[in-house]
A protein has these predicted regions:
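C-terminal accessory extensions appended to soluble enzyme cores
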Residues: 429-481
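Cysteine-centered iron-sulfur cluster-binding motifs in ferredoxin-type domains/subunits
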Residues: 227-235
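Conserved Radical SAM active-site core
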Residues: 166-225, 238-343
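N-terminal chloroplast transit peptides
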Residues: 7-10, 14-47
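Flexible, acidic/Gly-rich N-terminal and inter-domain linker regions that tether
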Residues: 56-60, 67-217
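Conserved AdoMet/S-adenosylmethionine-binding subsite of the radical SAM
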Residues: 259-262, 266-269, 273, 282-429, ...
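N-terminal, immediately post-signal peptide pro-regions of secreted/luminal proteins
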Residues: 32-70
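Short, charged/polar micro-motifs that form catalytic or ligand-binding hotspots
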Residues: 120-124, 212-213, 225, 251, ...
Length: 481
């Protein structure tokens, strides 16, 4: 007989499969009596018929109940300080959009309803999560302009991010109404999307089973993926670490043992930097952060570790984390202690893709709070088609960052993973865009390096274009090996 734990695990797996199907099995009611169903790559309206609750409806209710606990656990890692929903996911996006759908009429109503089902289908493959702050403050919700809104495109997945073959594979599996077939199709598509590029899982990792959440590719820098920080306030559609968020431990980096992590640092005196990444380390409460980093308040502890970097989007996706969340002051006090008592450099590696992210007083207040704690903020972002592939956007972004005391750091190129084909920009165009943006910028903004790309051997920068033997060629150099 199987143990209770194993039975529970099997039941949970089955219910999650049912939940997958439940999210997309029922046609979407348009609030006015009609329904909308996805057919191929388009949508159509249909007649609405009421009927007694079916077994499928019951399955949907059971599935929704089974995943409710997981949703609550996921968002409980930091205290909410704002609206009803701290995060919008595929499970509650319909509730969030209901007000906008109800307030719309005619074609606008239809477009919003179509978008909702498109999001729910795409989110079966790509992780979807968006903070209520972003939904309320950074997105223009005019249905006519959504496709042109950079923040909407940055955060809301669409089936168009998949190849036509993968779209059809997903739609066929969904149409079968078999949750096992749908789960298998989703897993196969994700595998085709190269979930951990450039040897992320096989290279530059210690062999110890106690060190499953660190990478040591460059001599001076160790990456830490704390297990409790492997989620974000919002998931970027282009995120190259999307595999961290799909619930598959086989492709996930996560460090649970803080003692083993600190021991590793002590065994490697060549290290000077630790980059805490994920996910987002600022999704964690301060107590969890301290379990990994608290000892660095003591200047005699591992003195060769001089720089603590935090890879984060919290600054513009949930700025309340540094201003009004329940433990915001405790977090800032801890960062300040690392600087003033521990003698460490605390660097916030802020992922900022568009100048609109820095347009709110909430973001500016968060910037000032971090700076007052002694942290240095540096900005970086990939260049992505339809989001920020415009020299004027980059020039405005860098100008605003310099105004706020943020140091422009990197312009990256899309990595070979996820929806790379949907978002990538040709190398020649990326180089020209960088040059055009730099020309519009003052010397203070010219700290930004790029366009650069990470690959298996190291980090490469496109330095220029030259004529070699009568042909144009890119001039590149390694920034790190």
């Amino acid at each position: 007989m199987a143990s209770p734990g194993k039975c529970s695990g099997k039941r949970s797996a089955v219910l999650r499969r049912l939940a997958l199907l439940a999210l997309v099995a029922a046609p979407l009611t348009d609030r006015a009596g009609g329904t909308f169903s996805l057919v191929g790559r388009g949508f159509h309206g249909g007649d609405h018929h009421t009927s007694p609750k079916s077994s499928k409806a019951h399955i949907r209710e059971v599935a929704a109940a089974s995943i409710a606990g997981a949703v609550l656990e996921d968002v409980a890692v930091a205290a909410p300080a704002m609206e009803k929903f701290r995060a919008i996911t595929s499970k509650n996006v319909e509730s969030f959009l209901k007000e906008r759908i109800d307030a719309s009429t005619g074609e606008k109503k239809l477009k919003l309803a179509q978008r909702l089902q498109d999001i729910q289908l795409a989110a079966l493959v790509f992780p979807f999560r968006c903070s209520s702050y972003v939904m309320e403050h950074l997105i223009n919700w005019d249905p006519e302009d959504l496709d042109q809104d950079p923040m909407y495109r940055l955060l809301f997945p669409t089936l168009q991010m998949l190849s036509r073959r993968h779209q059809q594979q997903l739609l066929d599996a969904r149409a079968s109404e078999d949750p096992f077939a749908l789960e298998a199709a989703v897993k196969a598509i994700r595998s085709d999307l190269n979930p951990q590029p450039a040897g992320q899982l096989t290279l530059n990792r210690p062999k110890s089973a106690a060190l499953q959440g660190i990478q040591h590719k460059y001599a001076e820098t160790c990456l830490l993926f704390p297990s409790a920080g492997q989620t974000c306030h919002a998931y970027c559609t282009y995120c190259f670490r999307w595999a961290q968020f799909i619930g598959d431990d086989d492709v996930r980096l996560a460090q649970k043992d803080s003692v083993a992590f600190l021991r590793y640092l002590g065994e490697h005196p060549e290290l000077s930097d630790v980059l805490i990444t994920g996910g987002d380390p600022f999704i964690m409460r301060v107590g969890l952060l301290k379990s990994y980093l608290g000892k660095f308040v003591d200047p005699s502890f591992l003195p060769h570790i001089q720089n603590l970097r935090f890879g984060t989007r919290t600054l513009t996706f949930w700025p309340q984390r540094f201003t009004s969340d329940q433990d915001a002051h405790e977090l800032l006090d801890f960062l300040q202690q690392l600087v003033e008592v521990g003698g460490r450099s605390v660097d916030i590696m802020a992922h900022i893709s568009h100048d609109v992210e820095l347009s709110t007083p909430h973001a500016e207040k968060a910037v000032r709070a971090l700076q007052a704690a002694g942290a240095t903020i540096r900005s970086q972002s990939p260049i992505m088609k339809g989001i920020n592939d415009d020299a004027d956007v980059w020039a405005r972004k860098w100008k605003r960052e310099v105004q706020l005391g943020i140091i422009p750091y990197y312009m990256f190129l899309a990595r070979d993973t996820g929806a790379q084909d949907y978002f990538s920009v040709p190398l020649a165009r990326a180089h020209q865009l960088y040059a055009d943006a730099i020309r519009q910028s003052s010397g203070l903004a010219r700290t930004a390096r790029g366009p650069s790309m990470s690959c298996t051997p190291g980090k490469v920068e496109i330095s220029g274009i030259e004529i070699v033997n009568g042909q144009k060629a890119f001039v590149m150099r390694f920034l790190q090996l």
